[in-house]
């Protein structure tokens, strides 16, 4: 059996303490007392006092141990906390002092084979195998089939389709290279404008929203307006017959057409920021193409920045 005593925070360096404890390690207690009593070191009386305390503890409290067979089984001096202080020097400077401490530990034993027993216990602990953990059976999960893409079937001939829509879809229009003048008012009556996908959807799907706003409008008389949708669609998605074009102050145009507008008041104000006039294009009837058309069908490579005459 063993008996352990500890004294903490002894005001001495653990390196100086090690010089003393190395003299008595694994020695019988009576021999250790003789060595410490004749060692002229500051730490020797401290070790001797703690050793006598350990012997007294065995004699009075450990009935299972034989005091006559005691020896120092383990003795260590571990480093404790270090206190930092300063020493004043010349010219206002200071040197730093380190006041080190030591923790002294002494373990006594009466069994000569104590070391072998301790090593055997460690080996036995390491040799114990951990309990086998049964592997968790994998749960097979069925893969959910992805929904197949819905194919848009072409419109059959017998479906109820507006003949006017069919006529407009089949009509071939090309870009007018030169800008229309007042003399071409009777012959030039179709234009193409650009708008966002959101505005186009509102224009063609909501019958009550039939007014689209622009910053400029053509001089010539226009009866038909094709609608080109910007990114990501980038196609002509439909057209509408133009009922009228009204130009006026920004506030008055909004008061008149706010309920019919395809955009909100916030978008309207942002669109006409810094402008004096607003241009309202009022749709009489809108036609949404069943199959949107590419710009190449109109001999165009990019969408109109303002409006483009077609013929």
Curated annotation (Swiss-Prot):
Role played: This protein binds specifically to 23S rRNA; its binding is stimulated by other ribosomal proteins, e.g. L4, L17, and L20. It is important during the early stages of 50S assembly. It makes multiple contacts with different domains of the 23S rRNA in the assembled 50S subunit and ribosome. The globular domain of the protein is located near the polypeptide exit tunnel on the outside of the subunit, while an extended beta-hairpin is found that lines the wall of the exit tunnel in the center of the 70S ribosome.
Family named by the database record: Belongs to the universal ribosomal protein uL22 family.
Keyword Ribonucleoprotein carried by entry: yes
Pfam families: Ribosomal_L22 (PF00237)
One Gene Ontology cellular component annotation held by this UniProt entry: cytosolic large ribosomal subunit
Transmembrane segments: none
Alphabetic keyword roster: Ribonucleoprotein, Ribosomal protein, RNA-binding, rRNA-binding
GO BP of this protein: translation
Assembly and binders: Part of the 50S ribosomal subunit.
GO molecular function, one term: rRNA binding
Protein name: Large ribosomal subunit protein uL22
Protein's UniProt keywords contain tRNA-binding: no
């Amino acid at each position: 059996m063993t008996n352990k005593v500890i004294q903490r925070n002894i005001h001495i360096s653990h390196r100086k303490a090690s010089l003393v404890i190395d003299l008595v390690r694994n020695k019988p207690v009576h021999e250790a007392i003789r060595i410490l009593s004749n060692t002229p070191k500051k730490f020797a009386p401290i070790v001797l006092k703690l050793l006598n305390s350990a012997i007294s503890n065995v004699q009075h409290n450990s009935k299972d141990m034989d005091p006559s067979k005691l020896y120092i089984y383990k003795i260590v001096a571990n480093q404790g906390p270090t206190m930092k202080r300063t020493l004043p020097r010349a010219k206002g400077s200071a040197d730093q002092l380190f006041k080190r401490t030591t923790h002294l530990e002494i373990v006594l034993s009466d069994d000569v084979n104590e070391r072998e027993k301790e090593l055997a216990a460690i080996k036995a602990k390491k040799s114990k195998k951990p309990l086998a953990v049964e592997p968790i059976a994998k749960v097979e999960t069925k893969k959910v089939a992805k929904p197949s893409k819905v194919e848009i079937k072409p419109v059959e001939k017998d479906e109820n389709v507006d003949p006017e829509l069919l006529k407009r879809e089949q009509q071939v229009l090309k870009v007018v290279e030169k800008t229309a003048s007042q003399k071409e008012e009777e012959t030039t009556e179709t234009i193409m404008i650009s708008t966002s996908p959101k505005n186009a959807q509102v224009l063609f799907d909501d019958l009550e929203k039939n007014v689209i706003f622009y910053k400029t409008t053509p001089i010539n008389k226009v009866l038909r307006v094709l609608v080109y949708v910007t990114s990501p669609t980038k196609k002509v998605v439909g057209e509408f017959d133009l009922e009228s074009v009204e130009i006026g102050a920004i506030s008055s145009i909004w008061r008149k057409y706010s309920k019919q507008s395809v955009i909100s008041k916030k978008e309207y104000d942002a669109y006409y920021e810094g402008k004096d006039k607003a241009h309202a294009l009022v749709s009489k009837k809108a036609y949404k193409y069943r199959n949107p058309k590419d710009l190449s069908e109109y001999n165009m490579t990019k969408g109109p920045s303002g409006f483009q005459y077609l013929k």
